[in-house]
């Protein structure tokens, strides 16, 4: 084959790759547009913009202490306005909803199933009580990330409501999509029923979650930092969405960070070893840490328990990890699927793939 033929072959290969990339981008754009349409369809009619809110409804006007301290009342009103105006989140009216049932309890508050009194549509409402306005700002940022990043596999947020109960107690209510259950609950049900996931089921779930995380890295420069089954919600039995962006970090200028974040069992080796050594700072690549956590999340779903993770947890030899994984997963899973997981849980961060590399690997192997 002469140089001209080689050049033509290379050009043809690049042309096919470009075409494939463009088709993938178009497919993602179509998915995002559909997600936006779904969001608009489900948007409650009580949602208003921050500029239209009557702040007096959200302040404890009758509080005796505030009545005798008008300067404090004025400060609270300013704090509340600042919180809402700077949030870029619409406001919803909790009085338009009836609480049906408490469906969950998180670190910062309870989650309820609520029904819109007028439309009868059901939603989830998270309610957080705090006496620290700084922590309120931090918690609010979690929901801003979800609201601003519309994707078919990221939980939809419709609005918030911030209220003062007295001179120092605030509540933050968040209205969002109502899922059937979180993935951790579904995995526990499978364990009780003795029903393992098939490879095709896991590939479908994996592709959904990976598409959201690829989108966050490539298009938004955001890392989640706490990927685990508890932070994945299931809709209609087959649709999986990432939730809980409380630890998420924008990485526009730097994708390495020193802070330790995440849940220890799903942490990358750098973070896990740092935690064991009681280190406060561990420099690591945020995206590659998320890839590792997603890999361990898949292993948990495969075994329906922590057995495989516990066996691999303290290993730093890639060949030993590979040997164990093949012994545990063959013949239930194909070589291609096992190889994808191995690339994700590579103990060496330098050679572990990020989500952009994972996107290509999914195309090539799955």
Give residue ranges: language-model regions:
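Conserved activation segment of eukaryotic-like protein kinases, specifically the C-terminal portion
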Residues: 257-275
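Juxta-kinase regulatory segment immediately upstream of eukaryotic protein kinase catalytic domains
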Residues: 40, 44-92
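Catalytic-loop of the protein kinase fold
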Residues: 217-235
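Activation segment signature within eukaryotic-like protein kinase domains
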Residues: 205-206
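Conserved N-lobe ATP-binding subsite of Hanks-type protein kinase domains
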Residues: 110
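Short beta-strand micro-motifs within the conserved protein kinase catalytic domain, predominantly
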Residues: 156-172
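Conserved short submotifs of the Hanks-type protein kinase catalytic core
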Residues: 168-182
């Amino acid at each position: 084959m002469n140089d001209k033929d080689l050049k033509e072959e290379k050009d043809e290969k690049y042309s096919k790759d470009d075409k494939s990339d463009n088709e993938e981008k178009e497919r993602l754009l179509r998915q995002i547009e559909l997600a936006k349409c779904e969001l608009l369809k489900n948007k409650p009619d009580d949602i208003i913009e921050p500029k239209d809110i009557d702040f007096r409804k959200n302040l404890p006007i009758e509080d005796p202490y505030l009545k005798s301290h008008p300067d404090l009342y004025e400060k609270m009103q300013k704090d509340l306005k600042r919180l809402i105006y700077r949030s870029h989140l619409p406001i919803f009216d909790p009085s338009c909803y009836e609480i049906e049932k408490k469906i969950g309890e998180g670190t910062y508050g309870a989650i309820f199933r609520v029904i819109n009194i007028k439309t009868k549509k059901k939603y989830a409402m998270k309610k957080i009580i705090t006496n620290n306005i700084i922590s309120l700002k931090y918690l609010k940022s979690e929901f801003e990330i979800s609201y601003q990043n519309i994707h078919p596999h990221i939980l939809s947020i419709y609005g918030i409501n911030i209220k003062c109960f007295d001179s120092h107690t605030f509540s933050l209510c968040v209205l969002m999509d109502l899922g059937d259950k979180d993935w951790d609950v579904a995995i526990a049900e499978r364990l009780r029923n003795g029903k393992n996931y098939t490879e095709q089921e896991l590939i479908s779930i994996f592709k959904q979650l990976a598409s959201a995380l690829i989108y966050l890295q490539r298009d938004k420069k955001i890392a989640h930092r706490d990927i685990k089954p508890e932070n994945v919600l299931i809709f209609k039995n087959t649709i999986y969405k990432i939730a809980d962006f409380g630890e998420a970090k924008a990485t526009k200028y730097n994708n390495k960070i020193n802070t330790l974040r995440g849940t220890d069992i799903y942490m990358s080796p750098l973070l896990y070893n740092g935690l064991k050594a009681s280190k406060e700072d561990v420099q690591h690549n945020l995206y590659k840490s998320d890839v590792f956590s997603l890999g361990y999340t898949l292993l948990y779903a495969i075994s329906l328990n922590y057995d495989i993770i516990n066996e691999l947890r303290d290993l730093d030899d890639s060949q030993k990890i590979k040997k164990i994984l093949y012994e545990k997963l063959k013949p239930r899973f194909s070589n291609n699927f096992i190889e994808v997981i191995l690339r994700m849980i590579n103990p060496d961060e330098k050679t572990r793939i990020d989500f952009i590399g994972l996107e290509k690997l999914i195309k090539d192997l799955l």
